[in-house]
Each structure stands twice: as C-alpha cells, then as structure tokens.
C-alpha cells in the first residue's frame, strides 16, 4: 500500500470531497509542499486514503492575518478557523496555507 503524502482529520473529509474546503493551514513541518505537487490524501485517524489533490497555491499567514476568505475556503467562520488552528497548533504564530483542488 502506498503511503499518504498529507492527512486531514476525518471530520474534514466530506468538505474536501465536496469542494467546500479548498485550503489547509499547516505548521512549518508541512511547509515544503509546492505548486504542482500531486498528493495522496488520507485520514489522520486511520491513514485511510480518500482522494488525490493538486497543490495550486501556497502562502504564509499568522493567526492575526487570517481573513474571512481563508475561513470560507476552510468552510468555517473566521472565529471557528482561529479556534481550530490555535487548538491544533498551540503556541505557534507562523502558518503555511496550501491551496488545493481534488483530482
């Protein structure tokens, strides 16, 4: 079985497959992805593969510079997005936005 290149919490799977979630915000450990990369996507909880994505953009962001656009791309409110990011990456300030599309 081929390993996944990136994982998402299972709760995001349906939004990704439906095209409602088109970005992911990660810490420095996942800042190496670049435009044009084709990635196998799995669930964080069980590593189960569920789709393939293409990276279509990358940028940097902080909690303070997150916008309503980022929130829409994550299919959340801005308040929800800030809460989720702070919960996943406590004590971090610099993040990496990966824009993607399902293939």
From Swiss-Prot:
GO terms for cellular component: cytosol. It comes from the Bacteria. Keywords: Hydrolase. Pfam families: ASCH (PF04266). InterPro entries: AC4CH, ASCH_domain, PUA-like_sf. Its EC number is 3.5.1.135. The active site is at residues 21, 24, 74. Residues 6-94 form the ASCH domain. It catalyses: N(4)-acetylcytidine + H2O = cytidine + acetate + H(+); N(4)-acetyl-2'-deoxycytidine + H2O = 2'-deoxycytidine + acetate + H(+); N(4)-acetylcytosine + H2O = cytosine + acetate + H(+). It is an enzyme of class 3 (hydrolase). SUPFAM superfamilies: PUA domain-like (SSF88697). GO terms for molecular function: hydrolase activity, acting on carbon-nitrogen (but not peptide) bonds, in linear amidines; N4-acetylcytidine amidohydrolase activity. PANTHER family: UCP029143 FAMILY PROTEIN. HAMAP family: ac4C_amidohydr. Catalyzes the hydrolysis of N(4)-acetylcytidine (ac4C). Belongs to the N(4)-acetylcytidine amidohydrolase family. This is N(4)-acetylcytidine amidohydrolase.
């Amino acid at each position: 079985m081929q390993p996944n290149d990136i994982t998402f919490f299972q709760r995001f799977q349906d939004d990704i497959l439906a095209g409602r979630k088109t970005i992911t915000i990660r810490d420095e450990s996942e800042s190496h992805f670049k435009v044009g990369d084709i990635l196998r996507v799995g669930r964080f909880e069980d590593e189960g593969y569920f789709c393939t994505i293409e990276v279509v953009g990358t940028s940097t962001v902080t909690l303070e510079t997150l916008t309503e656009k980022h929130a829409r791309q994550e299919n959340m409110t801005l308040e929800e997005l800030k809460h989720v990011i702070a919960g996943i990456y406590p004590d971090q300030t610099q993040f990496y936005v990966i824009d993607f599309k399902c293939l």
